[in-house]
Amino acid sequence: MLYTVSHSPYHCDLSALLRLATSEDDILLLQDGVIAALKESETLKLLLNNPASLFVLEDDVIARGLVGQISDNATLISYTHFVDLTLRHQQQLAW
């Protein structure tokens, strides 16, 4: 499953998402959700301890002035890769 997180980690229940995610899933942070991938944040630690792969939409990082502040452990992707993720996963859940 592809989980898309578009809200700030301070305005959504990421712990509930993380209880559902498995190693076969991908998590994509976009819009205000990119805040969850800030270096040294508690939210990032939770995301990285989960078996799902973590992706961050690069255009949204740039739009929020967060270039250089996102963890190297999260994979920055383009819209093209976002489309690839949607094609790979038959199911998607917006968080």
From Swiss-Prot:
Membrane-spanning parts: none
Pfam family, one: DsrH
Signal peptide: none
Keyword flag Kinase: no
Locations listed in the record: Cytoplasm
SUPFAM superfamilies referenced in this protein's UniProt entry, alphabetically: DsrEFH-like
Keywords: Cytoplasm, tRNA processing
GO cellular component: sulfurtransferase complex
Subunit relationships: Heterohexamer, formed by a dimer of trimers. The hexameric TusBCD complex contains 2 copies each of TusB, TusC and TusD. The TusBCD complex interacts with TusE.
Alphabetized PANTHER family for the sequence: PROTEIN TUSB
HAMAP family cross-referenced by the UniProt entry: Thiourid_synth_B
The protein, known as: Protein TusB
Species assigned in the record: Yersinia pestis
Gene this chain is encoded by: tusB
